[in-house]
C-alpha cells in the first residue's frame, strides 16, 4: 500500500495513486470552514449518532465542501486516513459551545491522519446536497464529478462479512 499512513498512525501519506483501489472511502460533508480547520488542525471529524449512514466503515474520509466554502464550494478536495472511532458527547468535542441545542447528543469522533489534497478537485456540477457517499479510492481517483461516486464499485471489495464489526478493523473506545 505504498507508504501511506496506516491505521495505527505510523508512516506518511504520499498520494492517492499509491493507495489500494479497493480501500473504502466515506465522503462526508464539511458544513462550515471551522469543520475543515478541526479536521486539519485537531485531526478529527464528527458525525451525530442519529445521522449515522448505513455503511459507516471506511479506511479514508473524503470531504465535500458545500456553498459555505465560497469559491471552493461544491467540491471534494481533501481526504485523510481514518485512525480510530470513539463515541463522545458534543459538548466534549466542542467545549466552547455548552449551550448548543445538541450539546448532550452522542457523536462519533473519527480521528484522522493528515489531510491530503486530491490532484484535481471533484466538482458537483448538478448534485449540490450531499451528506454521505460510500465509495472506494479507485472511484475517487476516476471521478470527474461527485455524481460518479454513486456508480456501483468497479473495484473488487472484500465481502461485507469481513467488515462485520462495522468499523473496518479500527478500534472503538
Where are these regions (language model features)?
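Structured alpha/beta reader/binder surfaces that contact nucleic acids or chromatin modification marks
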Residues: 2-173
Amino acid at each position: 500500500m505504498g507508504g501511506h499512513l496506516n491505521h495505527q498512525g505510523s508512516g506518511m501519506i504520499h498520494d492517492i495513486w499509491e493507495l489500494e483501489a479497493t480501500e473504502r472511502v466515506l465522503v462526508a460533508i464539511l458544513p462550515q470552514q471551522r469543520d475543515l480547520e478541526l479536521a486539519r488542525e485537531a485531526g478529527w471529524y464528527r458525525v451525530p449518532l442519529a445521522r449515522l449512514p448505513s455503511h459507516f466503515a471506511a479506511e479514508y474520509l473524503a470531504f465535500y465542501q458545500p456553498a459555505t466554502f465560497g469559491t471552493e464550494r461544491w467540491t471534494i478536495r481533501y481526504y485523510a486516513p481514518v485512525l480510530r472511532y470513539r463515541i463522545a458527547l458534543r459538548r466534549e468535542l466542542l467545549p466552547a459551545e455548552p449551550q448548543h441545542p445538541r450539546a448532550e447528543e452522542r457523536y462519533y469522533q473519527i480521528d484522522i491522519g493528515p489531510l491530503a489534497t486530491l490532484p484535481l478537485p471533484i466538482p458537483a456540477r448538478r448534485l449540490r446536497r450531499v451528506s454521505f457517499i460510500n465509495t472506494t479510492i479507485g472511484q475517487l481517483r476516476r471521478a470527474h464529478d461527485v455524481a460518479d461516486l454513486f456508480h456501483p464499485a468497479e473495484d473488487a471489495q472484500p465481502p461485507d462479512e469481513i467488515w462485520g464489526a462495522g468499523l473496518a478493523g479500527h478500534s472503538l473506545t
